[in-house]
């Protein structure tokens, strides 16, 4: 947010400074303030982008190499940048929460995921699933309601939300939720299939979402699919320890 405040202050100073110096009137002062803000924001964004992109690329390489602790530290080191770049902190906390969860640090994961941006659909879905498994259905549905409102075309989010509603015998609400999603994405096959299943009073299936679904821990995968715990996209799983 510092960036917005700084750009606004600079733009207003330049725009209305000209008015005070009698260079232009009120209308031009407002116009030039907007122009100065846009120019300042572009310059600022370019500067921070040149720092952020290499840092994120380094984190990706660390995760692909299975260097989980190092990747977590790199993400933590970027948190101060969240004071300057809007929404960045929430995205970083989302990545850190996913990383902590798939590293087996559940308590730390929940703490981080609570601070994740509502637009980080995968992180918010995971947090809701953890609460649901812990029996806190109210909190789970609060998280899902907001996440679904923000991520309106996230098929797995909507289907998982409906699955949990159906699980607690709120099938009518589950149908209404999927119907709402199908208005935006009428050709989504997994959603159409689950909608039909709900209408026929049969069990929903999430197999179409493959390991992304099973990694949430609400259902066990078929034995043919192997071990359930998987890292997020772009992550490598930590090596198995010998003797276990």
Where are the regions a protein language model picked out?
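Terminal, low-structured helical/coil segments at or just beyond the last alpha-helical repeat
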Residues: 9-11, 181-244
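Solenoid-like repeat scaffolds
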Residues: 42-47, 77-85, 113-120, 146-152, ...
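Alpha-helical linker/edge segments of TPR/alpha-solenoid repeat scaffolds
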Residues: 50, 67, 97-108, 135-143, ...
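N-terminal topogenic membrane-targeting module
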Residues: 25-28, 36-107, 111-114
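Helical anchoring/docking segments at protein termini
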Residues: 1-51, 223-244
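Alpha-helical adaptor scaffolds
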Residues: 82, 86-163
């Amino acid at each position: 947010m510092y960036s917005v405040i700084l750009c606004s202050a600079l733009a207003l100073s330049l725009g209305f400074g000209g008015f005070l110096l009698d260079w232009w009137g009120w209308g031009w002062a407002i116009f030039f303030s907007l122009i100065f803000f846009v120019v300042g924001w572009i310059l600022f964004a370019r500067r921070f982008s040149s720092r952020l992109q290499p840092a994120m690329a380094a984190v990706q390489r660390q995760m692909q190499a299975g260097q989980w602790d190092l990747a977590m530290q790199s993400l933590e080191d970027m948190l101060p940048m969240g004071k300057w770049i809007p929404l960045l902190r929430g995205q970083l906390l989302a990545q850190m929460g996913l990383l902590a969860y798939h590293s087996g640090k559940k308590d730390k994961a929940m703490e981080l995921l609570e601070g994740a941006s509502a637009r980080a659909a995968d992180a918010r879905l995971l947090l809701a699933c953890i609460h649901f498994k812990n029996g806190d259905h109210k909190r789970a549905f609060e998280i899902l309601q907001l996440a679904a409102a923000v991520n309106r075309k996230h098929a797995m989010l909507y289907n998982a939300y409906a699955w949990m509603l159906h699980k607690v015998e709120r099938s009518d609400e589950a149908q209404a939720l999927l119907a709402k999603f199908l208005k935006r994405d009428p050709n989504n096959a997994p959603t159409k299939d689950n909608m039909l299943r709900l209408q026929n009073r049969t069990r929903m299936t999430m197999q179409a979402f493959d390991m992304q679904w099973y990694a949430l821990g609400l259902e066990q995968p078929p034995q043919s699919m192997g071990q359930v715990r998987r890292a997020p996209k772009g992550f490598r799983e930590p090596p198995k320890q010998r003797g276990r």
